[in-house]
């Protein structure tokens, strides 16, 4: 699942990963399953946070990046009309500023145009040129984090209205600690350390998220339908 997302977003991704099973295979010391692309040599930016504050950490990454970027966009807008060679490039950049995929090429073109310009205003923008492109912010974690230990923070982030994405690896148990029942476990489910079976139903995290009215929720299974999972 993580590989599929990185194939879709690649170097445009920022990932905040909760401690747990997804961080064990996702960032154990000396190895990493994440890689760079052949064209630019860059890949996803990945960082591991605590179990209990991963959602807030991911939101902080997004707010911090977008705050710097908003300041740069203001400076870019101020350049309009001062240099005829820059105007067309600036217009294309501003038209796509809220689209991660569409903004990639215009951002690179803007950086090249600013470097060619050499004016004082362009130099000021180029100091933080890595913030010009629109990025995709992701919060990764297992069901122990999303349904239980980190749920309060996750709910806060989802209620904030900020542009972040959340991927929950729902194994329906605490996988990292050996197999205890979690709030994601189904009624009657038997785990290694919950042999008596769970007596209550699975928490419906998807339905809870949908009650906000503006959150897009999808549940996928790669083995069931790869095409639908990609959509």
PLM ranges: what are they?
Residues 1-19, 23-30:
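N-terminal amphipathic, basic-rich helices that act as targeting or association modules
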Residues 2, 61, 65, 69, ...:
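Generic structural signal for well-ordered, non-membrane alpha-helical segments
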Residues 3-11, 70-77, 152-155, 159, ...:
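A broad, structural surface signal
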Residues 9, 18, 95-100, 204, ...:
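Alpha-helix initiation/capping motif
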Residues 14-24, 67, 74-75, 79-82, ...:
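Carboxylate/His-rich catalytic cores and anion/metal-binding grooves
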Residues 23-51:
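Terminal amphipathic helices with adjacent charged low-complexity linkers/tails
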Residues 25-26, 35, 117-119, 124-231:
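Thiamine diphosphate
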Residues 50-121:
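N-terminal leader/propeptide and maturation segments of large enzyme subunits in energy/redox metabolism
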């Amino acid at each position: 699942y993580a590989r599929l997302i990185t194939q879709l977003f690649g170097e445009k991704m920022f990932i905040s990963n909760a401690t747990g099973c997804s961080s064990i295979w996702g960032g154990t010391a000396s190895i990493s399953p994440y890689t760079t692309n052949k064209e630019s040599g860059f890949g996803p930016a990945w960082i591991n946070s605590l179990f209990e504050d991963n959602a807030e950490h991911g939101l902080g990454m997004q707010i911090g990046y977008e705050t710097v970027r908003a300041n740069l966009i203001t400076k870019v807008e101020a350049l309009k009309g001062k240099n005829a060679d820059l105007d067309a490039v600036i217009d294309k950049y501003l038209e796509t500023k809220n689209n991660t995929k569409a903004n990639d090429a215009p951002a690179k073109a803007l950086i090249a145009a600013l470097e060619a310009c050499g004016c004082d205003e362009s130099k000021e923008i180029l100091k933080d040129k890595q913030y010009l492109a629109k990025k995709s912010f992701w919060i990764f974690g297992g069901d122990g984090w999303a349904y239980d230990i980190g749920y309060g923070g996750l709910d806060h982030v989802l209620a904030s209205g900020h542009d972040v994405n959340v991927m929950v690896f729902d194994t329906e148990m605490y996988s990292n600690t050996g197999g205890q029942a979690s709030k994601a476990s189904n009624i009657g489910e038997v785990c290694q350390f919950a042999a008596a079976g769970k007596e209550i139903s699975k928490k419906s995290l998807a339905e809870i998220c949908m009650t906000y009215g503006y959150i897009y929720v999808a549940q996928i299974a790669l083995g069931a339908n790869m095409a639908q999972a990609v959509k």
